[in-house]
């Protein structure tokens, strides 16, 4: 059973990535509270815009890019090969996103409902959507990311299947469109139009179709049959196999 679950090494890496990402979620929640109070309130749908003395847009975009770099860096350290690193990134991103709202809600008293609208991201345009939408994506990322990291730890790296990758890209594109469609329409009006934007309807049918494709790609990759053994994979899986009490490195 321990081998199937990935052993202590696998769960140690999963826990380490999750704790790091959860701590980042708290830091993100605290930083966003400060920024939104500077701009007139924590609820982006009802706040009255107040322009601070210094423009913070460039700093905020840079902070978001730095956050992605931090998540990617810890994923590169946690994984040994493509499966572990990709899995660690999914786990870190999903945990960060979920814990951000788990910390933000009690600290700020908002959102009051999973259907409240929020500004989700700013790169390349503002992403708008109900809080529930990114939470669903984050949950799928956590489950599939942890599964990939555990599989790598036990030396059972799944085969990379390009049809699943294409399905995931298509699903991600559909979800991204639902988030930025309103901002893309308003972009012609410049920064003032983007600041004044308050979406009123979310394209749930398109989002759910994209989410189904994205989740299927995530989970399909995490559960795919193991790739044929290679010398590189043997080196990556050697620590997990050597730790097995029966020493049966080649018995499956």
Positions of predicted regions on the chain:
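Interfacial helix-loop-helix junctions of multi-pass membrane proteins
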Residues: 34-40, 102-121, 184-195
């Amino acid at each position: 059973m321990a081998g199937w679950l990935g052993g202590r090494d696998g769960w140690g890496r999963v826990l380490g990535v999750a704790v790091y990402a959860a701590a980042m979620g708290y830091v993100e929640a605290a930083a966003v509270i400060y920024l939104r109070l500077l701009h007139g309130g924590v609820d982006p749908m009802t706040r009255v815009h107040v322009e601070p003395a210094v423009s913070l847009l460039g700093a905020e975009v840079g902070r978001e890019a730095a956050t992605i770099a931090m998540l990617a860096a810890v994923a590169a350290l946690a994984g040994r090969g493509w499966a572990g690193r990709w899995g660690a990134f999914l786990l870190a991103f999903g945990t960060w996103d979920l814990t951000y709202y788990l910390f933000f809600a009690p600290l700020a008293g908002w959102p009051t409902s999973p259907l409240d609208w929020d500004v989700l991201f700013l790169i390349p345009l503002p992403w708008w959507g109900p809080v529930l939408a990114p939470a669903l994506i984050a949950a799928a990322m956590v489950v599939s990311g942890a599964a990939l990291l555990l599989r790598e730890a036990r030396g059972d790296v799944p085969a990379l299947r390009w049809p699943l990758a294409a399905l995931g890209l298509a699903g991600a594109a559909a979800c991204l469109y639902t988030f930025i469609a309103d901002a893309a329409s308003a972009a012609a009006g410049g920064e003032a139009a983007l600041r004044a934007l308050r979406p009123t309807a979310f394209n749930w049918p398109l989002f759910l179709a994209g989410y189904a494709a994205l989740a299927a790609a995530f989970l399909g990759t995490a559960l795919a049959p193991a790739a044929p053994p290679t010398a590189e994979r043997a080196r990556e899986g050697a620590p997990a196999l050597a730790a097995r009490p029966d020493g049966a490195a080649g018995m499956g």
